[in-house]
Amino acid sequence: RDLDTRWPPPRRYHADVIRNLKNAGATLIVYDVLFSGPTTPEDDIALDKALKEAVNVVLTSRIDRNFTQLSKSLEEPHYDDELGIDFLAAARVGFAEVPTDADQIVRRFVPTMKFRDEWIPSLASAAFLAFTGKEETDIQVERDHIVVGGQTIPRTGPTVIDLVDKAPVPSAYMDFPAGNGTFPMTSFGQVALDEFSKVQFN
């Protein structure tokens, strides 16, 4: 049985997913969905409440580039002071930007990018920092490696230059020989409806 709705589903379903994963024993919930901007007050309040109750969620942001004005902006999870909504009040955040090669295959990742002269974490780095109890600012970029929360990542991938602010974008190749089906999968609808095996989440 699945949800009778199209993607993106109303945010109340995301609230159910977060709450059910938390109740199932998930140590960390990494949510690769950008919750920017408002939807309905009821749905936004429901998601805000679930995030604040869970306190173990990492959300997604996006770096937007204006190539005409040569400026960057950070599209972050939603907040509304009048309604008391702040999705980041009890959650972490990391940018979702995954480089692909010419054949559209993902072989490397970007652990961090520079935004307004500060190194900010990718979604994967933010998840690692949250899991290990480190601060989001615990990132150092050196000539041949990156240190994220005390973990050294060799800069084995190419370093490209951001066309907007000319900042270096370091990358590292991933050692992941496995394919689809390596990890067990559960549908969004099953988790939202609380019809899933809890064993794989604790």
Task: Put a short name on every predicted segment.
Residues 104, 156-160, 164-170, 176-202:
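Extracytoplasmic
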